[in-house]
């Protein structure tokens, strides 16, 4: 069975927040090849919050920190403030150690630097999906 499929046979559902359409499509292709189901794309933080409100049972969110309108950092805390934090993997060019440490300490599952590499995406996302989200 592919890593993107739960033991009950249901694909794990993913939301992608990415300011580059090309990168979002690339990320979706990588995840879908492993059985994940991408259920939505957001090009800015406000769109992601709206999508999250519509899909509260999403299994995982990939979050770029360099989003327009509402950046990924603010978006993370907006979603966290809604209750149970879903699994969130940061996929970003942002690499300030203090920022990343804070997000991990606050419940983000992992960080993947850009440019994205298929092996690294699958390694980190597959590991995150096995973890229980932090409350």
UniProtKB/Swiss-Prot annotation:
Response regulatory domain: residues covered: 13-129
Pfam family for this entry, one: Response_reg
Keyword presence, Ribonucleoprotein: no
Any one of the GO BP annotations: phosphorelay signal transduction system
Protein name (record): Uncharacterized protein LIC_11769
Keyword vocabulary terms for this entry: Phosphoprotein
Modified residues (4-aspartylphosphate): 64
Matching InterPro entries: CheY-like_superfamily, Sig_transdc_resp-reg_receiver, ST_Response_Regulator
């Amino acid at each position: 069975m592919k890593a993107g499929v739960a033991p009950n046979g249901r694909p794990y559902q993913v939301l992608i927040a990415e300011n580059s359409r090309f990168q979002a499509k690339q990320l979706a292709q990588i995840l879908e090849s492993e059985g994940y189901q991408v259920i939505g794309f957001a090009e800015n933080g406000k769109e992601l919050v709206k999508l999250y409100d519509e899909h509260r049972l999403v299994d995982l969110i990939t979050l770029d920190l360099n989003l327009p309108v509402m950046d990924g950092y603010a978006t993370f805390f907006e979603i966290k403030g809604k209750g149970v934090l879903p699994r969130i993997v940061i996929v970003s060019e942002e690499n300030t150690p203090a920022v990343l440490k804070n997000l991990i300490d606050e419940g983000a599952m992992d960080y993947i630097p850009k440019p994205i590499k298929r092996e690294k995406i699958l390694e980190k996302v597959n590991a995150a999906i096995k973890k229980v989200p932090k409350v």
